[in-house]
Amino acid sequence: MRSDTIKQGIERTPHRALIKGTGVPQSEMAKPFIGVATSFTDLIPGHVGMRDLERFIEKGIHSGGGYAFFFGIPGVCDGIAMGHKGMHYSLPTRELIADMVESVAEAHRLDGLVLLTNCDKITPGMLMAAARLDIPTIVVTAGPMMAGRGVEGRRFSFVTDTFEAMARYKAGVIDAKELQVCEDNACPGMGSCQGLFTANTMAILTETLGMSLPRCGTALAVSALKRRIAFASGEKIVDLVRNGVTPRQILTRAAFENAIRVDLALGGSSNTVLHLLAIAREAGVDLPLETFDILSKETPQIASMNPAGEYFMEDLDAAGGVVGVLKQLGGTIKDSPTVLGLTTRELASTVESVDERVIRPVSDPVKKEGGIAVLFGNLAPKGAVVKQSGVSAPMMQFEGTARCFDSEELAMAALMGGKITSGDVVVIRYEGPKGGPGMREMLAPTATLMGLGLGDSVALVTDGRFSGGTRGPCIGHISPEAAEGGPIALVEEGDRIRLDIPNRKLELLVDESILAERRSRWVAPEPKIKTGWLARYAKVVTSAYTGAVTTAE
């Protein structure tokens, strides 16, 4: 065992003394040492229930014959960090989390890991660490929140009933009393936000990848099932250690293709593009950005999930969960191993029935193509990403007038000030991985766009990214970004921009000679943040089309 490095031999007397100083008895020293990386915090509703899950994981580890050690991992709530300086830190924490898990596991020679996670950047950061370390690992996602409940059966969700409600109030569609009702009911308790936003999409993809047990991706945070899954995960990690099953045996090219297909079939968050690219890189799997679009063209969207659709995570779980989606996708799913020991196809074969009102058959899809499309053109030579499942039919092809803003705050001021009108294309730039820095989510502008009723007449393009709660004609991840001198930096007020999602095009309708002249006089702006770790991050982070990872190269 790896932990024998710190447990065996006369020269390890000091190490054993320190371990015994934590209360570990001699009788337990020969057992596998299992690290439980817990991202508990009472700052985030998605993580407040983790103390309970920690107990069940620990019980499972002891039942399986291991010894559990807990260590803490930070968590940032994107919703709370949204719309201010805090959002600069969200995506970069993904890298910090991966580095922290690696550091603790290597420094203490842990035999295996249980990664307790839930919200947006924490789950991919944990998975990056698992792939990098390649020691036996299982992931427990803490589960989605229940829908908020109102009179006459009304169900509330976080994004629709907060960010979009705020804009509806500003537009005079609802009054202050209704806005207060939304605020009080949008988040009824523990769990990740109720729709197919980034946290829940990543939980689903973690299960699809084979890194968590069946139903873990959809079982509600408040459920007894979630606690049983936590216990079973604790037992299973000891089995994985004894059998030498490691993440790179599970995180194969086939596993990533399966995850992408499930993401596309459900209409998941566009953030998953960044995260899957980053995880694949750590796993040594070649996964070009174009893969998402290739699979999108042959994978129908078979569920209508909130925020763009009607169903919540609790509906998806009751309808069959991830294995139900695998069953409906049938032969397009490749056989790939999982931590349970069964392959993906074997798991799908165990499903007896699926609620086809929620998870439709591929013969009767919600849309013929998957939820995400990758666009290219002279505005995005290295690509851009759109969650096409959230775009209305009239906006799938659109041409409009550029309105340019060099930060999210400036764009929000224009939107809330009534300065954006039908036919505009809102351009938000210098918000990429380097330029932000941190590639902030543009949820406030996109939700405002929808709340003001402009979702069928105004598009938004950015080198930043979007929340999983975003819907509407919003194109992000434009690469190269403005801070690197990408074409988005050359757009000027009044330019015409053409969006053509069916044909995967994003074009700036300006003659190349004019763009060349603009390029000759372009000067990179001063960094927005010059001190602290974000200043270091901006120097080493890569472009969105490679996953916005940090590298020493």
UniProtKB/Swiss-Prot annotation:
S-S bridge residues: none
Transmembrane feature ranges: none
Q: Which reaction does it catalyse?
A: (2R)-2,3-dihydroxy-3-methylbutanoate = 3-methyl-2-oxobutanoate + H2O; (2R,3R)-2,3-dihydroxy-3-methylpentanoate = (S)-3-methyl-2-oxopentanoate + H2O
The keyword rRNA-binding belongs to this UniProt entry's keyword annotation: no
Name its GO BP terms in alphabetical order: isoleucine biosynthetic process; L-valine biosynthetic process
InterPro entries for this protein: Dihydro-acid_dehy_C, DihydroxyA_deHydtase, DiOHA_6PGluconate_deHydtase_CS, ILV_EDD_C, ILV_EDD_N, IlvD/EDD_N
> Recorded E.C. number(s)?
4.2.1.9
The source's domain of life comes to Bacteria
Q: What class of enzyme is it?
A: lyase
- Cellular component aspect of the GO annotation: cytosol
Needed cofactors, names only, are: [2Fe-2S] cluster; Mg(2+)
Give the annotated active site.
S467
| UniProt KW keywords | 2Fe-2S, Amino-acid biosynthesis, Branched-chain amino acid biosynthesis, Iron, Iron-sulfur, Lyase, Magnesium, Metal-binding
Fetch the Pfam families from UniProt.
ILV_EDD_C, ILVD_EDD_N
Name positions with the PTM N6-carboxylysine: K121
Q: What does this protein do?
A: Functions in the biosynthesis of branched-chain amino acids. Catalyzes the dehydration of (2R,3R)-2,3-dihydroxy-3-methylpentanoate (2,3-dihydroxy-3-methylvalerate) into 2-oxo-3-methylpentanoate (2-oxo-3-methylvalerate) and of (2R)-2,3-dihydroxy-3-methylbutanoate (2,3-dihydroxyisovalerate) into 2-oxo-3-methylbutanoate (2-oxoisovalerate), the penultimate precursor to L-isoleucine and L-valine, respectively.
Protein name, UniProt field: Dihydroxy-acid dehydratase
Organism expressing this protein natively: Geobacter metallireducens (strain ATCC 53774 / DSM 7210 / GS-15)
